[in-house]
Design a protein with these regions (language model features):
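Switch I (effector-binding) loop of TRAFAC-class P-loop GTPase G-domains
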Residues: 18-47
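Inter-motif core of Ras-like GTPase G domains
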Residues: 59-81, 88, 94-98
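Switch II (G3) loop of P-loop NTPases
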Residues: 45-60
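The beta1-alpha1 cofactor-binding region of Rossmann-like NAD(H)/NADP(H)-dependent oxidoreductases
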Residues: 53-56, 82, 143
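Conserved P-loop small GTPase signature centered on TRAFAC-class small GTPases
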Residues: 1-11, 15-18, 40-45, 86, ...
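WD40-repeat beta-propellers
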Residues: 49-51, 84, 91
Length: 179
């Protein structure tokens, strides 16, 4: 599940990962979006289900439905917006309270506008280590850093390396939970 404040670039990151596309003309996500992405790990193809949650306050009550059974949460912030970075702590707490086994990756978006940076890599790395997470810095606009961050996250957190089996499991409602 992708989580983060409004306008940090969650949907743009997903579009770059899945379609290798970016549009400056993007409308905010309403409610939640759904995508599938196939990731190759150890010569196996893993199907991930990606839930793109809206960051607007009026939709925040919907998010727990999607991270309750998630295997992983991708917490996105805007490196040019310090407030969006400080909110990552609340996102991690909310997910951890509902789903203690959920794994995290912290993603700083908008690396293409370095001159407007408000959050240092060192600060983001430090916070990610507090969550036992990895930190990735990307630009959905240019594609910088996009090549490996989801594959690394899936490899590190969602694949049982001893048996090389998917950890994505069916919940009681028959739907799979994932990113």
């Amino acid at each position: 599940v992708f989580l983060g404040d409004m306008a940090v670039g969650k949907t743009s990151i997903i579009n770059r990962c899945i379609r290798n596309a970016f549009s400056d003309l993007h409308t905010p996500t309403v409610g939640v979006g759904y995508e599938q992405m196939y990731v190759k790990v150890n010569e196996k193809t893993i199907r991930t289900e990606i839930w793109d949650t809206a960051g607007q306050e009026k939709y925040l009550s919907l998010a727990p439905m999607y991270y309750k059974n998630a295997q992983g949460a991708i917490i996105v912030f805007d490196i040019t917006n310090y407030h969006s970075f400080t909110r990552t702590k609340q996102w991690v707490k909310q997910v951890s309270d509902e789903n203690p086994s959920c794994k995290f990756i912290l993603v700083g978006n908008k690396a293409d506008i370095e001159q407007q940076r408000e959050v240092t890599k060192q600060l983001a790395d430090k916070l990610a280590s507090e969550y036992n997470a990895i930190y990735a810095e990307v630009s959905a606009k240019t594609g910088e850093g996009m090549d490996n961050f989801i594959q690394n996250f899936v490899t590190r957190n969602l694949v049982d390396t001893e048996t090389n089996k998917k950890l994505i499991s069916f919940g009681s409602n028959g739907r799979k939970g994932c990113c």
